[in-house]
Amino acid sequence: MMRTAHKDREPWRDIRRSLLSKWQGVRVCDEPSPWYMSIPTPFSQFHNVLPEEQEEMVFTELKLFLVGNQTENIRIDEYDKHDLPISILANISFDPFIRSELERFHDILVTVATIKICCYAITHDSVTFSSISSAVASTIEKKVNGFITKICTKLSGSTEANQQMNQLLREMHTIHESLNFYNGIVKSIYLDQLIGGQVLSLLDSKRRHVFSGNVVQNLDDVFQAGWKVFARSIGRLVCKFEADHMDYEFVIWSTKQMTDSQCKTLVPSNPSRQIKSSRYVVIESLCPDFFKKYLDILVRCAEFGDSAKSDSSLRRSTSKKINESESVESVMEDVRNVDWSNLDVATTVRMLVQFSRKESACLLREITSATNVDQAIRDIHDLLIKGSCAHDVMLFGLKADILQKPIDEVGNIRMKKLTNDVLGAAAEKHHPFWKYFSFVIDKQNVFEMLGQRTSLGGNADNLRDNVTPMLFECISVKMDCPIEIEPIISMKAVFILTPVFRIWIQLHVASYTIANYRDSIRGQMPSRSLGDIAMKKHLMHALDAEISSIKQKWVGYVDLLINLYYERIQKAASLDEYTECQDILASDVTNMMGISELSQLENIKDILNIIWNYDNADSNLADLIADFEEVQSRARMDVVVA
């Protein structure tokens, strides 16, 4: 059976076909459709057959054609490249009047034949199509058969033999609108090889363009047939934390039958929705368009499944007990007895939202009871927001003679040693959660990175300088969060705050560099260099005061914001609220520090560049002083404008 290749074929289609091929019981449509089997013999010639007898014959054969058969005198004349009928041919021996009457049935016959052929292919090919596709096609086929059976039964009892064809035509025209909609649906599914949520998206869009009451009801019935299968998969995910591992048509697939390469193929490099568990993968294109705003809830349910299992083992290994009425298991009893397949879209969404809130609250209590989350959060704040290890990083970097080396000269072994010397040692004493962090090299300029994140990110090019990056400019941190508390740690907040840590490193190195410069000119008399020494001392003093002012302001901001954070976190009643508090803190920190605004960010960058360029052979002292005065002028202007 010919069918065009799917446009822009998504990689998940080939993987799905490969996974389904492992199941011997999966139906594959490798036989031609039994509907409208061709008749090899040519048309017979009529001799001495009265027009009334021909009309009776045509009426009978029309009914046979409508139920799926080519006949002696009415046949499909031509197929398109997809093996779908496009024209009907009647016996040329018919009376001209009879042939003209048959022409009035042409579109109806082509439509019915197309529906039957497409429905057979869809319902008998579980590899190309899916359970939802099959349920929709089967429902449409039953409805069309019901329409035709009802009409044929009604006309069989008619006493007006002379008007049978006219009556049949009138009856078929009453359902012609429904037939056209059904034809459009099954042809789209058949030609575009739609499965899962793609079918539901198609049906939902069709419903929005129908205004006839009967057609609306019929399309609603078809939609519910497909939605029932999708809702059943939702129930299995929510109640048993099982993703799709049989039909591979649901929006969340199980990875237990997949190879590593298949999993990597299905996970995009920049996914809009990441799922933390390695047991699942999200196929966003299989989510119905009208349901995508609720996809995050489904993803969370899948993640809750892993969290609930890991937290259950944690509870067994700890002496702390959780009230049984507050456990995830008790909350799940509320949804396990629900027949999800009988819920409509609105009820399903309402159930999901309610369950997600309850489950989130339970997991929050369980995680905080089983692990020392407060300590983990404090350690993250100390490392990223307060820059508590920045001074130690500088000292150990100087000791190892790598701090001011180009990044190309610093390998992974030295970075690992720096991690052990600073973070590893601190983890053994005061900051146990630091053991999940490690130092890495990020070659992107931190100010360029922050400039791209601002609302004026288009001007980020202004932040680039043609300087060779040294290690202290590129040191960053990476967190490998333990799975038992992963749901409660906001990776978004960690992402936002990582540049803050990087700037803390540069501020400490700047203070150290200024101190060295001041030591080098201490004791020298101004008269020896015609005033240059005095200007250098003045510049160093001003730069030192500026860096100290920035650090003091940041410390004050951090203390205030962390106190506000702990006030908010005490009111958090769910995982969402808990992680939202972390996101709010991260946003507030960057806003109050001024690094979320391009003008203030540029001021900090320019001050640091003056310090880094001070000792360059091609630097001019007067130019550096002029640059510094310009920075101060811009800063004062920002204050006035604010």
UniProtKB/Swiss-Prot annotation:
InterPro entries on file: GCP_N (IPR041470)
Localization (cell): Cell junction, Hemidesmosome; Cell junction, Adherens junction
Cellular-component GO terms for this entry: adherens junction; hemidesmosome; microtubule
Superkingdom of origin organism: Eukaryota
Keyword Kinase: no
Keywords (A to Z) from UniProt: Cell junction, Microtubule
Pfam families named among the record's database cross-references: GCP_N_terminal (PF17681)
Main location: other
Function in brief: Recruited to hemidesomosomes in early embryonic elongation to direct the nucleation and growth of non-centrosomal microtubules.
Name this polypeptide is given: Gamma-tubulin interacting protein 2
